[in-house]
Amino acid sequence: MKFGVGWLSATLTATAIFLQHGDARSQAPPPIQHVSELDNVVIHTPSHRIHSHSSFDITFTIHNNAEPIKLKLEPNHDVLAEDAEVQYLNADGTISHTESIDRRDHRVFKGSAWTEIEPDHWTYVGWARLYVKRDGPDPLFEGTFSLMHDYHNIKLRSSYMRTRSDSDIIPAEKDEDYMVMFRNSDMYWDEEHTELKRSLPNPSCQADKLDFNADPNHPVFRPPQQSANLAAMSFDQLLGLSKRQSDTGGVGGNTGGINLASTIGDTTGCPKNKLVALVGVATDCNFLNAFGNNQSAARADVISMFNSASSVYESTFNISLGLKNLTMSPAECPDVSSTVTPWNMPCTSGNISSRLTDFTAWRGDQNDTNAYWTLMTNCPTDSEVGVSWLGQLCVHGSSNASVAGANVVVKTSTEWQVFARDIPLVPYMTATLRHVNKASRERHNAAR
């Protein structure tokens, strides 16, 4: 499929909606200062039961019953590719066995969020993504919903404690697991309120120490041009547009020579038919260790992360994220990393940049057409929880410098936001985008 210049311009400008001041690395989120419990939770179906293909409403209250919330949900059929599979590795990095990922095993939903401004009068306030872990009269679920552009993150207390930093508030301990919620606006430092911080100029940034990212001839560092002539730009320049600092030109930013100030937020030309970008994920020993060697829990966490992150791209570009390949390392970290999977090493070995380099070389050997591969780990480097190559989306092969479409994401309380920020989609992903057409929908309906 060919994509027109109109879509290219729209996609690049729309990127600024979410990827403001973006670059090749992500810092850890600020401390969580406040959490709320979900009360009066009801799944509005007969017997409060659902399955993977159900459409239903969930209602609950937050902030000590002060605010009623309704989530109107339907299945997210795109979160898993039809032929999605998981590979389980041995300690030496060789493949132990491979299994298909059955969509029916994962109750993953998308939809909208509503608030009750007066009795029986509900107002739309944003989008919603949920992964239901338990249905019935006492349900448990995790996910995210947006209320007036403030992300509300729902986690089981056990999941929250798994990623809690020393500065985060500690929810009350109870006899049984329960759901807690924190907003992005509940995350701030004592003196300044920020969300996930990304900063290129900091010389301590691990991404800046990568020779490829620091190359002054890289397209993302080229000065702005007088004309935003997309048709005259080289493919390399287009690749570089995935890094953004400022879309208005000037000293602080670079857009590969395009000034997009007048078109930020304009989605004219975006695809009318939904497209899906297929992505591969590998998890290292440290990631699985965070789940107590529970492979099912780790797999569900990755799928839930995809579900939430995809909402940003669906609403902006009409492009969804779909998990195609999942490669899982055993929980026991090797004393010496294998030559097959050199990225699988203890947190005490290497840093986030060396993990990216090793993982990218491995990614280059994979025979697939995925748009991107992500390594999930539990090993930050200082405050850095994400790193990627500049402008390398859809680059499949590795070079002598081991540069390709890959990134590293560290498990955090808001890992879905790190994941979303590090895979800015662009419209030349022709090899990895597929139409969600009528035939596909018919196959999904037949599976019910």
What are these model-derived regions, one by one?
Residues 2-178, 347-353:
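N-terminal prosegments of processed precursors
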Residues 6, 129-146, 300-317, 431, ...:
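Classical protein tyrosine phosphatase
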Residues 25-51, 189-402:
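Fold-level signature of zinc-dependent metallopeptidase catalytic domains
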Residues 103, 301-305, 412-416:
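Short, glycine/acidic-rich beta->alpha junctions
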Residues 139-216, 223-225:
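Non-catalytic, regulatory and substrate/membrane-recognition segments associated with hydrolase enzymes
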Residues 324-350, 399-448:
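The catalytic-center signature of Zn2+-dependent metalloproteases
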